[in-house]
Amino acid sequence: IGELLGLTWDCVDVSEEAIAENRTYIFINKQVERVSRNAVDELDAKEVILIFPSQKKNNKTVRVLKTPKTDTSERKVYIPKFVAQILVDIKKEQNELKDILGSEYQDYNLVMATTFGLPIEDSYLRDQMQKVIDEQGLPDVVFHSLRHTSVTYKLKLSGGDIKAVQGDSGHAQADMVTEAYGHIID
C-alpha cells in the first residue's frame, strides 16, 4: 500500500501520446510510511524525501515519503489503457480542486491524495476496498491479495519467466517469487 500511496505525478506517464501508443506506465520509486516521531531521527537522511505535517497536535507518529526498502523495489510498471484513463480523470479532478481551494490545497504531487492534497491513510484505502468487497458480495481478501493475484497472472502470462516477474513485482530475490508462487509454475 505504501508504494501506491507514495506514487507522485512525476512518475506517471499517461500522456495522450503514451495512451495512443499503448505505453502508459508508472515508475515506483517512493512510498508513504507511518513512523514514530522518534524513529524519524533514526532513518537514514537519504531515505526520507519528505515528512508530512501532522494533522493532530500530539500525534506520536508522522507520515513520511521515503525511498523503498531495496533498489529492486524501484521499477517501471506498464499499465493498461483503462487504468491510464482513470489516472487522467484523477489528475483533472485534482487540478479542479487546486483551482477551487487555492492555498488551502497542499500540493505534494501525490496521485492518491485527500481533497486537500494530503496523503491518504492506508486504513482508508483498506476500508474502501472492504466496502467494494461487501457491496459486490466478493470473497474477503486483504489488500496484499491484489499483489499476489498480479504476480500469479504475470507468471502464467509469461510462461513462468521468474526473472521478468521478479523485476516487475519488485521482489529483491528470485527465490522470493519461486517460494511464494512456485506452485503456479508446476
Task: Give a label for each model feature.
Residues 1-3, 124, 128-135, 145-173, ...:
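C-terminal catalytic core of tyrosine-transesterase DNA break-rejoin enzymes
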Residues 15-16, 28, 36-40, 87, ...:
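Extended hydrophobic-aromatic, low-complexity segments
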